[in-house]
Amino acid sequence: MFRTMLKSKIHRATVTQADLHYVGSVTVDADLMDAADLLEGEQVAIVDVTNGARLETYVITGERGSGVIGINGAAAHLIEPGDLVILISYGVMDELEARSVRPKVIFVDADNRIVERGQDPGHAPAGSGLAGTAASVTSAITEAAAETDDAAKLDALLQQPEH
């Protein structure tokens, strides 16, 4: 079975521009694309923290170091400059990869400069004013339990007599 898992996210970026007459997509600073492991043309979900809008589009590369997050095409009706957004990329993977994937979680400041890189989707940086500690603790406990369960299964397999 294949599962769709969080691959990366850019958390609470500020939309810097919107162009209704552009041919679709979201323009993302190349530095942010690299940090979040996004490729040009890759599908992303955009969640607008400011107004609750949610949509899917694809990424195009913006000028490196510019901090650009540009909403293009019809999405400009839903998301405006100044809105806070979360860009989310998912990956389709087999069971083994799904259980071991460590997403790239990128937090940015108001100018879309990277302030923290992580792998815990439930973590909120200190001083951000965001809730997340409980989710991080729950995630760590769940991960530890999964590792213990996996280790027990491996031990059981190793102890089976060969045929």
Swiss-Prot record:
It comes from the Bacteria. The keyword Lyase applies. Signal peptide: none annotated. Its cofactor is pyruvate. Keywords: Autocatalytic cleavage, Cytoplasm, Decarboxylase, Lyase, Pantothenate biosynthesis, Pyruvate, Schiff base, Zymogen. NCBIfam families: panD. Catalyzes the pyruvoyl-dependent decarboxylation of aspartate to produce beta-alanine. Heterooctamer of four alpha and four beta subunits. This is Aspartate 1-decarboxylase. Pathway: Cofactor biosynthesis; (R)-pantothenate biosynthesis; beta-alanine from L-aspartate: step 1/1. The keyword Cytoplasm applies. It is an enzyme of class 4 (lyase). Is synthesized initially as an inactive proenzyme, which is activated by self-cleavage at a specific serine bond to produce a beta-subunit with a hydroxyl group at its C-terminus and an alpha-subunit with a pyruvoyl group at its N-terminus.
